[in-house]
């Protein structure tokens, strides 16, 4: 059964600007080291950062919480399987809330066009 859905859209040019400004503190606050390494290794890294940020926001919306209840940006990590399919890896408070809400699965869709990155997250309950 579907528990919640969340969607978020991000302007990629914001992340292009953050990269140009070399705003490393922002990236360290928003993204895990694995996400930073993944994005930095891509030709269009701003696009990949924007997609990951949108997915984190979409997850928070799907939970109906926002960034509160002790959650941090590092509690939600966007990962890809061997075929490139995106998914979420949860840590800390996000993992605890996921279990407390009896959630069983996340579904993630990422897309981009022009200057925009969009993510949708669906949460399933057992």
UniProtKB/Swiss-Prot annotation:
Any one GO biological process: fatty acid biosynthetic process
Keywords per UniProt: Cytoplasm, Fatty acid biosynthesis, Fatty acid metabolism, Lipid biosynthesis, Lipid metabolism, Magnesium, Metal-binding, Transferase
Molecular function, one GO term: magnesium ion binding
Cofactor (UniProt): Mg(2+)
Gene Ontology annotations for the cellular component aspect, listed alphabetically: cytoplasm
Alphabetized Pfam families for the sequence: ACPS
Record-listed Mg(2+) binding positions: 8, 57
Cell compartments where the protein resides: Cytoplasm
Catalytic activity: apo-[ACP] + CoA = holo-[ACP] + adenosine 3',5'-bisphosphate + H(+)
InterPro entries in the record: 4-PPantetheinyl_Trfase_dom (IPR008278), 4-PPantetheinyl_Trfase_dom_sf (IPR037143), ACPS (IPR002582), Ppantetheine-prot_Trfase_dom (IPR004568)
Source organism superkingdom: Bacteria
Enzyme Commission (EC) number: 2.7.8.7
Broadest EC class assigned to this enzyme: transferase
Family annotation (Gene3D superfamilies): 4'-phosphopantetheinyl transferase domain
Predominant subcellular localization, coarse grouping: cytoplasm
Function: Transfers the 4'-phosphopantetheine moiety from coenzyme A to a Ser of acyl-carrier-protein.
Similarity comment: family membership: Belongs to the P-Pant transferase superfamily. AcpS family.
Annotated protein name in UniProt: Holo-[acyl-carrier-protein] synthase
Lineage: Bacteria, Pseudomonadati, Thermodesulfobacteriota, Desulfuromonadia, Geobacterales
Gene name as annotated: acpS
């Amino acid at each position: 059964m579907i528990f919640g859905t969340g969607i978020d859209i991000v302007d990629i040019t914001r992340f292009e600007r953050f990269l140009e400004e070399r705003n490393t503190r922002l990236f360290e606050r928003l993204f895990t080291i694995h996400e930073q390494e993944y994005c930095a290794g891509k030709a269009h890294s701003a696009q990949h950062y924007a997609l990951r940020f949108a997915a984190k926001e979409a997850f928070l919306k799907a939970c109906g919480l926002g960034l509160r209840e002790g959650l941090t940006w590092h509690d939600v990590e966007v990962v890809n399987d061997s075929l490139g399919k995106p998914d979420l890896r949860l840590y800390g408070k996000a993992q605890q809330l996921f279990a407390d809400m009896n959630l069983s699965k996340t579904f993630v869709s990422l897309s981009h066009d022009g200057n925009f990155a969009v993510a949708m997250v669906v949460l399933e309950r057992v």
